[in-house]
């Protein structure tokens, strides 16, 4: 069974991707910090044998690195992002933290693990 990581797997697009992959028998590791844009759609699959959920901010590089190293996924779908333009104008800091710094952390983890795992990164913007 191919392992994949989905960051932001509890948002609107993420839940649909996670459920699509589960139905196709992938082992899915969902990483999400469960902010305002999360939903509980994945509750229906939480007991599936091919699904794991970790409440985690992708800015936590140490834990992110650990999960990638442990599961050695074949692909990572990066959907983790702060959304809603209005919110970004009123308070841009969380958007910069997740959308830029968090993505950088993910890239750094993959760079540091490049000799240990062969993984494809699919970045959704």
What do the PLM-derived regions correspond to, one by one?
Residues 1-125:
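N-terminal Rossmann-like NAD(P)+-binding domain of SDR-like oxidoreductases, especially those catalyzing
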């Amino acid at each position: 069974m191919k392992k994949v990581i989905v960051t932001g797997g509890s948002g609107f697009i993420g839940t649909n991707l996670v459920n699509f992959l589960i139905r196709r028998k992938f082992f899915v590791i969902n990483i999400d910090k469960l902010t305002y844009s999360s939903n509980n759609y994945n509750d229906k699959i939480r007991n599936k044998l091919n699904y794991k959920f970790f409440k985690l901010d992708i800015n936590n590089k140490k834990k992110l690195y650990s999960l990638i190293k442990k599961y050695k996924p074949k692909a990572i779908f990066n959907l983790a992002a702060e959304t809603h333009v209005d919110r970004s104008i009123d308070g841009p800091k969380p958007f910069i933290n997740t959308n830029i710094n968090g993505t950088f952390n993910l890239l750094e983890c993959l760079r540091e693990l490049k000799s240990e795992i062969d993984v494809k990164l699919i970045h959704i913007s």
